[in-house]
Amino acid sequence: MIHPREVLEGPILAVSRQTKSVVDIPGAPKRYSFAKVSAPIEVPGLLDLQLDSFAWLIGTPEWRARQQEEFGEGARITSGLENILEELSPIQDYSGNMSLSLSEPRFEPVKNTIDEAKEKDINYAAPLYVTAEFVNNTTGEIKSQTVFIGDFPMMTDKGTFIINGTERVVVSQLVRSPGVYFDQTIDKSTERPLHAVKVIPSRGAWLEFDVDKRDSVGVRIDRKRRQPVTVLLKALGWTTEQITERFGFSEIMMSTLESDGVANTDEALLEIYRKQRPGEQPTRDLAQSLLDNSFFKAKRYDLAKVGRYKINRKLGLGGDNDGLMTLTEEDIATAIEYLVRLHAGERVMTSPTGEEIPVETDDIDHFGNRRLRTVGELIQNQVRVGLSRMERVVRERMTTQDAESITPTSLINVRPVSAAIREFFGTSQLSQFMDQNNSLSGLTHKRRLSALGPGGLSRERAGIEVRDVHPSHYGRMCPIETPEGPNIGLIGSLASYARVNPFGFIETPYRRVIDGKLTDQIDYLTADEEDRFVVAQANTHYDEDGVITDESVTVRLKDGDIAMVSRTDVDYMDVSPRQMVSVGTAMIPFLEHDDANRALMGANMQKQAVPLVRAEAPFVGTGMELRAAYDAGDLVITPKAGVVENVTADIVTIMDDEGKRDTYVLRKFQRTNQGTSYNQKPLVNQGDRVEAGQVIADGPGTFNGEMSLGRNLLVAFMPWEGHNYEDAIILNQNIVEQDILTSIHIEEHEIDARDTKLGAEEITRDIPNVSEEVLKDLDERGIVRIGADVRDGDILVGKVTPKGETELTPEERLLRAIFGEKAREVRDTSMKVPHGETGKVIGVRRFSREDDDDLAPGVNEMIRVYVAQKRKIQDGDKLAGRHGNKGVVGKILPQEDMPFLPDGTPVDIILNTHGVPRRMNIGQVLETHLGWLAAAGWSVDPEDPKNAELIKTLPKELYDVPAGSLTATPVFDGASNEELAGLLANSRPNRDGDVMVNADGKATLIDGRSGEPYPYPVSIGYMYMLKLHHLVDEKIHARSTGPYSMITQQPLGGKAQFGGQRFGEMEVWAMQAYGAAYTLQELLTIKSDDVVGRVKVYEAIVKGENIPDPGIPESFKVLLKELQSLCLNVEVLSADGTPMELAGDDDDFDQAGASLGINLSRDERSDADTA
């Protein structure tokens, strides 16, 4: 076996480093855990995927120190940027007399802080410089200069980039690895297996060999026409004797050799050239250089380190040619030999190095054949594109400029490089607007793996196989967390313990087992390596010495097969039961009892939870909450121990043990990308002692340093008067009044004052035709004051724009002369609160050219207003649990009408029982039981005979748990049904000495309206409920008048366009079914697009007359025009058969409108933006 470490030279990607263990986090809240398996290692740093990859790209000092430590002092270590500069250098002119080399990339300090970059809409970037050395080979002259390449976006410590003021994430891409792939297809006519092999480089032409149904071996170069494979071998200089000597064992190769029709190398080269470049006149030299450039020249062909590693492993070529990034004749010959042996049905072959290698086809969906392009490599590829564009410019300038006066700076044009970087961050499919809905959504976004994007798959072409869960995903990519919809299976999430190796393959850790005994050795294995071992699961029983106690053990073999083997045959064991799932999925308690489809929804909906005004940690957790919040980067963590000196709402000052004062500024009520509120709250008090690594302030959606996205609510499973039919939810009014599910949402409104052709726009309080009442909240500049309560239509910023000058009347000229400029024509273009929005102004930012702010060309002033809205839970809002159990609030009942327990406690929420059985997410019921136990507490007497079975599995620290405790039931290693049943029988009584919930988890509930008990006991307990981002306030919409489409003259559609409701085909059928002909005619004409009719109706209503008859709808006229455009002569005939002219009513329309002084047919251009 070739170990990945042995073939490493040049680009070295960092391996994930161990981060702080959960048990080491000082001040962490106490959770009572039901875990039976203790993991030998902690979860690696959850952001290492991003941070380490970027550290490799720019070569940070910390990264270099880690590499020196791992590979020894003498090892040659190059960063990603150094690699591409080495690849590119030297750039020579066409004659070879001059060359330019680039080296030593280095960064100056970042220009702006992260907050400044966000505020000013600029990039968080550092200037990049390289050393450029120009050599004139004829004179021997060397000129060296430092060249500025451009501002290079830098990653923040949270793994994000700030581009144009917004936070973005670069998602890692899953692509097929370069290498050699053998494939089998069945011929439809003969039903015989046909075999093919593809040699796929990182960059360059594909080389494909295949055996067709006539048993001839062919080759395709760069997807061009097929030709006999012996033609290629002869073109490489092989004689017939050499071919016979190497492939004489194969009849199909010999028959191909006899029928190839070329006698020698020259003929073979010309034949290849004709196939590759049909229509061009071939010469031997041209043909030879075409073949050399295609596969044997590093400029045109690059296998990359990973491609060379994969080819050597597959074909058993040893490690002698590790540094070679092009193909060799031996690669080609061995690939052909492997193919013909595979076709002959052989199972093993001897490689050129004498190694016995298996002969088998490859599974392209196997994670041994798919690798990750992480952020560093994606940016590196983009810089390479920019530098290759720059290289062309440098070559041209070398030939055109005077050799004596050339300097490196005169040759280099850095525009292509900075443009390529800007294009990648701004427009690439893999550079995404960060999901900041809550802490978990940001964390999982950074750990996302996408098979889409440039060089990847497209969602239209991707089949079922590539989307499906594969055995090699185990411990590498989560089988649960993926989007629903067209991207299912193409976008995944990194498993919790996984890391990326230097080649981009995902590795997962296993614990070494030798002769049935566990060792402390942890090996990270790729999917390829894992296939050769026998792996037991994490919950395999072993004694205190680590010896496996079961004689036969359930294990996983190659291709995911499950078998029972002797304990001495086990090679490895999983490190943790949650090894196969992602961070988001690992936060679903009792995941093992949920159907995978519902678990997928649960994992995805946690990312949609909005942070609440008051967070609350879940009674039932999984133990992952602390670590997820800690690594997400939204908590404030002190790096040094000390004493808290001062605490306010937004500043914490700590005097550390060295006598140095550290000040931490908290972020208060800032807007996130999704419009939720980002707010940090201090957790420490003045005089507290804090340790290094302690959480001193909570972020959004965290509580005491734990991820806390929802609230614990007392839930009853029962139907209630049909109000919770079809997943509707009934809530207690108390939840609204106590602000239990209240969230804060912040909207940003922006307006700028520009120079127009008619003069400059002005931000002012002096707005024409507006009463003082409307201006009451504006300051003297015309900007709304902070703290003002605003609702839709209120002015936030007053602005006037010059109107077009018209011919002035004598009276206006007189006014102009008396009052000066004041009487000039301006129109009100103030920024108003959009339709349907209300809130309180919490911030105003003003940027002005006078203050030297960097504004876009033509903009003199820009104002941003932040409006915060407190949204209480209401009918129509969406709530969900963590098990995919989602629903919409259907009714909010007064507290006195809710069912209540015998001690008078009303339930918070009523869920329908029908939501459980067919969805098979039983985890929600178990969570409810354990939630009740955590809230009530329990006490187990180990001496009591009824607890004999319970104490066999229950950890000793769980015998006595107080009320209101937090519990952890890790996925696949949590509380069992028997434990829950046993604990329910031992739950603590309430203060009156009564036990409310029986041993079966049910209670007698009393109807709040009648005071009568319900006839059957009801399942009751605490469930953790999330309020999702799908809020009814953002969806509800109504329109009276508004913009029309210019073509059809019908109202626009959708809330964003302030559109109307579509009365569609099916609605028309309903009207027809009821025979409501006149109502239907009205809907399709005067209420929609009968332009003349709708004005006349308005006129009739104003004048108190009868409604006139409808005319012809505009959409009918459009239909006629479309038919005429297809050269069909369409006429409208009257009842007596005479042709009618449709376009004659406009005069009536104009007169009616003019007489009323209105124009109802406003088009979308003028109105859609103001609506």
From Swiss-Prot:
Record GO cellular component, one term: DNA-directed RNA polymerase complex
GO biological process: DNA-templated transcription
Matching CDD domains: RNA_pol_B_RPB2
UniProt entry tagged with the keyword DNA-binding: no
Molecular function GO labels: DNA binding; DNA-directed RNA polymerase activity; ribonucleoside binding
Assigned keywords, A-Z: DNA-directed RNA polymerase, Nucleotidyltransferase, Transcription, Transferase
Coiled-coil region(s): none
Described purpose of this protein according to its UniProt entry: DNA-dependent RNA polymerase catalyzes the transcription of DNA into RNA using the four ribonucleoside triphosphates as substrates.
Quaternary structure, from the entry: The RNAP catalytic core consists of 2 alpha, 1 beta, 1 beta' and 1 omega subunit. When a sigma factor is associated with the core the holoenzyme is formed, which can initiate transcription.
Name used for this protein in its record: DNA-directed RNA polymerase subunit beta
Organism annotation: Corynebacterium efficiens (strain DSM 44549 / YS-314 / AJ 12310 / JCM 11189 / NBRC 100395)
Organism ancestry: Bacteria, Bacillati, Actinomycetota, Actinomycetes, Mycobacteriales
Gene name in the database record: rpoB
